[in-house]
Amino acid sequence: MDIIGGQHLRQMWDDLADVYGHKTALICESSGGVVNRYSYLELNQEINRTANLFYTLGIRKGDKVALHLDNCPEFIFCWFGLAKIGAIMVPINARLLREESTWILQNSQACLLVTSAQFYPMYQQIQQEDASQLRHICLIDMALPADDGVSSFTQLKNQQPATLCYAPPLSTDDTAEILFTSGTTSRPKGVVITHYNLRFAGYYSAWQCALRDDDVYLTVMPAFHIDCQCTAAMAAFSAGATFVLVEKYSARAFWGQVQKYRATITECIPMMIRTLMVQPPSANDRQHRLREVMFYLNLSEQEKDAFCERFGVSLLTSYGMTETIVGIIGDRPGDKRRWPSIGRAGFCYEAEIRDDHNRPLPAGELGEICIKGVPGKTIFKEYFLNPKATAKVLEADGWLHTGDTGYRDEEGFFYFVDRRCNMIKRGGENVSCVELENIIATHPKIQDIVVVGIKDSIRDEAIKAFVVLNEGETLSEEEFFCFCEQNMAKFKVPSYLEIRKDLPRNCSGKIIRKNLK
């Protein structure tokens, strides 16, 4: 069954411009308070100009272009401009450092990068080291360094016509994006997302929160994340609603932004809720038009009740991951909600709890949460150039193993219990323990290392490192944290360090992590 009617992203934007014309499509607010607004017609024209820009730089169907950007209009222009010419977006987490960004460039085969001045020195060094296939960099800032292979994105875009110059044949099965996500291995994997995936995500997420064209969907989630793209942006655009993209989250500013833009839908993670709750109470806390707050794991019932009571909102729970594209289990529009359940399987999906032998379990029994979808349509297509990793999580008949533990009740409500894999959830970011351990293990004084997540009242989990030093060595906290800050993104840097004589292991030599909690 073709739910999206065979329409790829190029057709979507041409249709949206025709149908909604001068209606506001996108509002972007920068950290400095600068606001840019675009109608559906204007946004489609900016997307066309950006597509033409890429074409003039030699980008063709199937080429990969990396984006290392904070939330900004240019991210939206590039995302859909690339899709219009059949090229592939490779978003890079804006908080990653050189080593991590180099890995993504190398393993995505990106040949062009769009970024801003603050990240340019890092990529200049990457180019000098000849560590990737990058042949050109576009900077979105007005000031431009006098370096070869660097262009002004804005100047080039403004020179382009507002009609599309290059329109190769497209299929909904074509890849639109490769989104690298942390896993249980030491390196991130590239999740392949098709035009169909994104079109379906728009319709599905719009259904999930009963979105209409008179809604205003505001998000502070980073544009390089799947939730901003598929739960928010694609939902808003697919419904002809207004999408408000705020550059950075500020607990002090957030509620004022919700009120200023008359938002009817927004999304929150636990870190946001906790930081909002410590703001001074205001008589205007309930002065808003929010109908739903899309919510993602994990919050206590006490915290949930206090937040909903203070701000007069309801939380619509949604559970998913990059590989599922959308929140495949969640609360349904008009249906009852059963906190702390994560909801029931959404339309087009099946969900089961399975045991270690891949057999379905009855209600009430703990096991792995597994989801059935259609690869390349309702769930991701594959991991880029990694068939072994794909086969490990995705069965031939479309069953996806999430690696998460949970159970369901007799009415089909699912409950999330814990993450099976060694992942730490930190302020909305997934952090791989193995990745951090491999980096820290390169310190010359460290013999053994394990990192674990510990409960944090603000950011879900904090990161604690347990290390064993080489004989005769000493290591100060200052030296340790300085090393980490130089070798990994800030959000991955451990908050705590404990030096031990040894680490607890089982008979097979594996570290017993639960003994370190």
Swiss-Prot record:
Catalytic activity of the protein: 4-(trimethylamino)butanoate + ATP + CoA = 4-(trimethylamino)butanoyl-CoA + AMP + diphosphate; crotonobetaine + ATP + CoA = crotonobetainyl-CoA + AMP + diphosphate; (R)-carnitine + ATP + CoA = (R)-carnitinyl-CoA + AMP + diphosphate
SUPFAM superfamilies cross-referenced by the UniProt entry: Acetyl-CoA synthetase-like
Gene3D superfamilies, alphabetized: 3.30.300.30, N-terminal domain of ligase-like (3.40.50.12780)
Enzyme Commission designation: 6.2.1.48
Enzyme class at the top of the EC tree: ligase
Keywords, ordered alphabetically: Ligase
Annotated metabolic or biological route of this protein: Amine and polyamine metabolism; carnitine metabolism
Molecular-function GO term, any one: crotonobetaine-CoA ligase activity
InterPro entries tied to this protein: AMP-bd_C, AMP-bd_C_sf, AMP-binding_CS, AMP-dep_synth/lig_dom, ANL_N_sf, CaiC
Annotated PROSITE patterns: AMP_BINDING
GO biological process annotation, one example: carnitine metabolic process
Family, as annotated: Belongs to the ATP-dependent AMP-binding enzyme family.
Function: Catalyzes the transfer of CoA to carnitine, generating the initial carnitinyl-CoA needed for the CaiB reaction cycle. Also has activity toward crotonobetaine and gamma-butyrobetaine.
Descriptive protein name: Crotonobetaine/carnitine--CoA ligase
Organism of derivation: Escherichia coli O45:K1 (strain S88 / ExPEC)
